[in-house]
């Protein structure tokens, strides 16, 4: 089954769910439904706050995982890598030694998202510290860190369909 471009984010979901999202997108009610379910954006606005937020989640759920050297918002992420967040191991030469550093980059798209959506993408990237592949163990770890992970992932994918179809910024800060 080939999906319309805005619905490509829902490719692995059952047809009845995709049809519901498509209908809501067509009648213009999808944005309002998401805004009703997730009324407010999060308060994490800069790289320092994002680093602290990710560090707190990591300390709570993954104490023994390797430390993160960098956590930043990335404006090019979705266009360049076709990803919403990435976790990278970067090799740096320090003196005569090679040091591996771990970084997490979150797409700027999530700056104006609800806290639940930010938590979902951060949990996803943190899970990659322990599990490299998107397999059963990976998703079990995601669900251990965020029990509502699967619903949040679906809602994020639904939001991405809306953004791609309309360009709507549901939680953009209001200007005075």
How would you describe each model-predicted region?
Residues 1-119, 129-176:
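Active-site-proximal or metal-binding-adjacent scaffold patches in catalytic folds
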Residues 125:
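Walker B catalytic acidic pair
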